[in-house]
Amino acid sequence: MPEEGVDLTEKGKLLSSEELVRIAKIFVDEGVKKIRLTGGEPLVRPDVIDLVAKLKALEGLETVAITTNGIVLAKKLDALKNAGLDMINLSLDTLEEKKYAFITRRPMAGFHKVMNSINKAIGYGYTPLKINCVVMRGLNEDEVTNFVGWTKDKPIDVRFIEYMPFDGNRWNDKKMVSYQGSTD
């Protein structure tokens, strides 16, 4: 999250559930089998439960997935499961509360909400739960082995993602840890 925050897109500029389902149907009719709702943060949509249910009802669509920051996932998980959500990817860049607060610009309590969401999702059978971790120089590159250890005995698959070094319209690779650099 940028230090200055982000401007939210006006509601009128977002696709409605009906528009999303109409577009999804076109893709499914052309052979797409899996649709993933991503963001921003898809769980802030007030109609996300209805959207998941409508997507799940599309004939030929096998999988409805979501990528979330996990902050409100635990609160919405019952309804999402009942709507037919098949898979969850959760973004988590650190296993340390203070780093979490710094990286996300959220209170440390958010970290506990995310961990609660992870445990609840696993309890609901979303396994393997997929965790996306963006590795950033000077922030969390020292935690890669911690993530591996944390997931060793849990039904969690962690995927380490290279930081995309865009700074406005400029390329800024100061925080980037390349795949090659992480294996050296």
Indicate where each model-derived feature is located.
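Proteins with a high burden of low-complexity, intrinsically disordered sequence enriched in S/T/G/P/A and R
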Residues: 1-4, 32, 65, 178-184
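A short, flexible beta-alpha/helix-coil linker loop
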Residues: 4-8, 97, 165-168
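Radical SAM/AdoMet-radical enzyme domain recognition
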Residues: 14-36, 45-157
